[in-house]
A protein has these predicted regions:
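Eukaryotic intrinsically disordered, low-complexity regulatory linkers and tails enriched in Ser/Thr/Pro
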Residues: 1-66
Length: 66
């Protein structure tokens, strides 16, 4: 999961495996495979960075035997 911030400042944790698309239309909208959409403060680039960092941690753990 990745931590993001709703426009009202409240944190939200999203399962990055369920992200279908991320778009910017004034605000950043994360659409999930469930059909739900979440508005967040983070930019598309920041969301991408967090997803990549999360996946790297997961795959590194799998390969190191942790």
């Amino acid at each position: 999961v990745i931590a993001l911030t709703r426009p009202n400042g409240h944190p939200v944790m999203l399962n990055c495996d369920l992200i279908e698309s991320v778009e910017r239309n004034g605000e950043t909208i994360v659409t999930l495979t469930t059909g739900n959409a979440v508005l967040v403060r983070e930019s598309m680039e920041e969301i991408e960075r967090r997803v990549v960092a999360f996946k790297r941690r997961i795959y590194a753990s799998a390969h190191s035997g942790e």
